[in-house]
């Protein structure tokens, strides 16, 4: 059975932002106060229905993954075998044939048929309604030898601020070949810790309340190691208070 969420307004009246806590999930917020409010959408939802158009969960997630500069445009396929609007499509074809005109070309005296164009429809979700995950900050690229330890946040610059949320992500993580260690003795007080490995990525989340002077020494204690004999690339990202703070690309050769 299809799971559908119905919104009262048009699609242009909502903002969508990728979730910081869950892969392939997003938050949708109504720009109009005291109407639909805020919803957390996961893959349990199949369809988002607005007053003007409908979009599937997969269409929205795909837009986040492949594009962040253009409008999301979905062109409906014309498929006579499809049950959707099948009768309307048949009517269009019949109308097209009935309204066709016979044209006799003066030069060649050949006869041709001119058909009226069929109607195709697009669904558009404006890109301006997709909020950026974060603004790019400092990025570095390093090359290390296989089996060599990497101090991930060694060059991390500290900024004085109160911190309530931290997310560390390691892309291309293989639990059989990769390992991560840190000094729990300097774990920032006031924070809780959880982690998970999903779809080739490790996610570490710290939540609570602490200061940068407590957090950064712990981050700098993080050491990554790889025991694979193959060359690879690992990407480490650090998000602090919902904003991207640092990105490190490590080439293992």
Swiss-Prot record:
The lineage of its organism: Bacteria, Pseudomonadati, Campylobacterota, Epsilonproteobacteria, Campylobacterales. Pfam families: DUF5416 (PF17437). This is Uncharacterized protein Cj0990c. InterPro entries: DUF5416.
